[in-house]
A protein has these predicted regions:
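Sec-dependent signal peptide recognition
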Residues: 2-8
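C-terminal motif of bacterial Sec signal peptides marking the signal peptidase cleavage site
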Residues: 15-17
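Insoluble glucan recognition modules
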Residues: 19-45, 51-56, 143-144, 148-150, ...
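Solvent-exposed serine/threonine-rich low-complexity stretches and specific carbohydrate-binding patches
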Residues: 69-83, 169-179, 213, 245-251, ...
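Short Pro-Gly-centered beta-turn/loop motif in secreted/extracellular proteins
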Residues: 85-100, 182-194, 257-268, 373-383
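Short, solvent-exposed S/T- and G/P-enriched segments that are highly enriched in secreted/extracellular
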Residues: 84-89, 170-185, 254-257, 367-372, ...
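Contiguous ligand/interfacial binding patches
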Residues: 163-219
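Short, low-hydrophobicity acidic/polar segments
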Residues: 26-158, 220, 301
Length: 438
C-alpha cells in the first residue's frame, strides 16, 4: 500500500507588537519570588480540532510554560476567545535571556496511549506542540513557533469498536469508533517497529513489518481490514440454504472467534468453511431462546439443536476450546456475561495421564449440559469420563468419533487412535462423546 501524508499546519504564536532590543540595555538582575501576568494572542487560531489540515483551539485548552523541564506556569484560553491565552508564570531567578519552553497540552508530556474517538478528528489534548522563546521576547511580543511533535494515523474501521494500533512495543487505542467513519490516532514519532492493529478483539488483516513516522505528518492507513477465520455463523440471519455464512474473525485468543453486528431472527449455528461437517458443526442441546449477554454451551454434532435467541442484533463470540458461544449486545465485552454454574463434577481419567487412571483432569462446564476438555493424547491412549471423581459413575465408548453413543455407565474405555491435541466434548443427557482435533 502506498504511503500518503499531508502536512499539519504548525501552531504559530504571534504577538501584537514587537519591541526592539536596545544594545545599551543594562544587565538584568533576577528578582527572587517574582511572578508576572502574561497575556498573549495565538494567531492564526490553531490546534485541537482537525478541519481538513487546519486545527483550532477549543474551550479549556491550556499551554504550559517550562524552564529546564520544570513547570513555571500555565496560560489558559480565555473564555469566549478563540486565540487569547492568559496566566501567571513564576519568573523568580530567571533572566530575560533565559529560554522558556511552551508546551501544549500544558500537563501532558507524552502522547496518551488511550484516546477518545472524535469523528473526522483526533482526541482533544492528544497531539503535542512545543516551542522555545527567550523570556524577554515573550514579554516584549516577539514571535514563537510551536512545532507539532506528533504524527497522525488516519483510518476507518469496518465495524464499530475500540481500535488499537501497536507500533513496536507501544499500543495506542482509540476508543468508541463507529463503523466506516474517518478517525485519527496520535502517535509518538520516536516509536517505530512492526505495525499491527485490532478492532475490539478481532485481529487486523494487514501488518507492516517495519513502520516509522515523522512529526507533523498524517499517514493514511485507509479502510482497515480484519483477519477472517474459517468459521462462520449460519441460520435464520436470512435463508439457511441460500445466504452465505457470516464470517467470524480471528482474535487475540486461541481458537476464539467473533462476528460483529449479526442480525439474528431465531436460530443459528456455527460451522467451518461453509459446509455441514459433523466435526465442525456447532449447536447446543436446548431449543429455549437465549437472551442478550448469554453464554451457550455447544458441541459438534449434526444432531445438535440450533442456538435460539431473541430476535435482534448481536456480537457473537465463539470459544471453540471451551465449547461456548457468547451472544452479546453490540459493544459489550464477552467478559460481562455470567458463566453457567456446573451441576456436577466431571473429569477425564486414562492412560494419557502420567499419574495413571486414578489421577483425573477436571473438565470445564460449558453450559446447557455440556462439558469440555482440551487434552494431548498419544496414539491408542484410552480414557473415560468420571462423575464426582468416582468409578461408580464413569462413562466410556467403544468408538470415539463425532456423535459417538456412550456404551453405558461403567462402559468400555474410549480409545484415541491417532496422536494429537483434541477437544473432548461430553453431553451426558444426550449420550454423546465427541473428539475433534484442535
Amino acid at each position: 500500500m502506498k504511503k500518503y501524508f499531508v502536512y499539519i499546519a504548525s501552531a504559530v504564536l504571534m504577538m501584537a507588537a514587537c519591541a526592539k532590543e536596545d544594545i545599551n540595555t543594562p544587565v538584568e538582575t533576577p528578582v527572587v519570588g517574582e511572578t508576572e501576568f502574561i497575556s498573549i494572542e495565538l494567531n492564526p487560531a490553531t490546534r485541537t480540532i482537525l478541519d481538513g489540515t487546519n486545527t483550532n483551539w477549543s474551550a479549556g485548552d491550556a499551554v504550559g510554560v517550562y524552564f529546564k523541564n520544570e513547570s513555571i506556569g500555565t496560560l489558559t484560553l480565555v473564555e469566549g476567545s478563540t486565540n487569547k491565552f492568559e496566566g501567571e508564570i513564576e519568573s523568580a531567578l530567571l533572566l530575560g535571556q533565559d529560554k522558556v519552553t511552551l508546551k501544549y497540552p500544558a500537563d501532558v508530556t507524552a502522547v496518551p496511549t488511550t484516546q477518545v474517538a472524535v469523528a473526522g478528528s483526533f482526541a482533544n489534548g492528544a497531539a503535542l506542540l512545543e516551542g522555545s522563546v527567550r523570556l524577554k521576547d515573550l514579554r516584549a511580543g516577539e514571535g514563537v513557533t510551536l512545532n507539532n511533535e506528533t504524527a497522525l494515523l488516519q483510518f476507518k474501521t469496518p465495524v464499530a469498536g475500540d481500535v488499537a494500533f501497536t507500533i513496536g512495543t507501544t499500543t495506542y487505542t482509540v476508543t468508541g469508533c463507529a463503523a466506516n467513519t474517518t478517525y485519527y490516532a496520535c502517535v509518538d514519532p520516536a516509536v517505530s517497529g512492526k505495525l499491527s492493529y485490532t478492532v475490539g478483539l478481532a485481529l487486523g488483516g494487514k501488518e507492516k513489518a517495519s513502520f516509522s513516522t515523522e512529526a507533523n505528518k498524517v499517514y493514511d492507513l485507509g479502510a482497515l481490514t480484519l483477519k477472517e477465520s474459517m468459521f462462520g455463523v449460519i441460520g435464520n440471519t436470512g435463508d439457511w440454504g441460500d445466504k452465505a455464512d457470516i464470517k467470524m474473525y480471528e482474535t487475540t485468543g486461541d481458537n476464539f472467534y467473533v462476528a460483529y453486528g449479526v442480525e439474528v431472527t431465531s436460530g443459528f449455528k456455527v460451522r467451518k468453511a461453509g459446509v455441514w461437517d459433523n466435526n465442525y458443526n456447532f449447536g447446543t442441546t436446548s431449543a429455549t431462546a437465549k437472551s442478550a449477554n448469554s453464554v451457550v454451551g455447544v458441541y459438534t454434532d449434526g444432531g445438535s439443536t440450533d442456538i435460539n435467541v431473541t430476535n435482534g442484533t448481536y456480537d457473537i463470540y465463539f470459544d471453540r476450546l471451551a465449547g461456548q458461544v457468547y451472544i452479546m449486545t453490540p459493544g459489550n465485552s464477552h467478559k460481562v456475561a455470567t458463566q453457567p454454574t456446573a451441576p456436577g463434577n466431571y473429569s477425564l481419567a486414562g492412560s494419557f495421564n502420567g499419574g495413571g487412571w486414578d489421577d483425573t483432569v477436571a473438565m470445564k462446564y460449558s453450559g446447557d449440559g455440556i462439558w469440555t476438555n482440551v487434552q494431548n493424547f498419544a496414539a491408542n491412549n484410552e480414557f473415560k469420563i468420571k462423575i464426582k471423581g468416582s468409578w461408580n459413575s464413569s462413562w466410556g465408548a467403544d468408538n470415539v468419533s463425532p456423535g459417538s453413543e456412550l456404551v453405558s455407565n461403567s462402559g468400555g474405555n474410549a480409545k484415541v487412535k491417532a496422536a494429537g491435541t483434541y477437544i473432548v466434548g461430553f453431553y451426558k443427557d444426550g449420550n454423546k462423546i465427541t473428539l475433534v482435533k484442535k
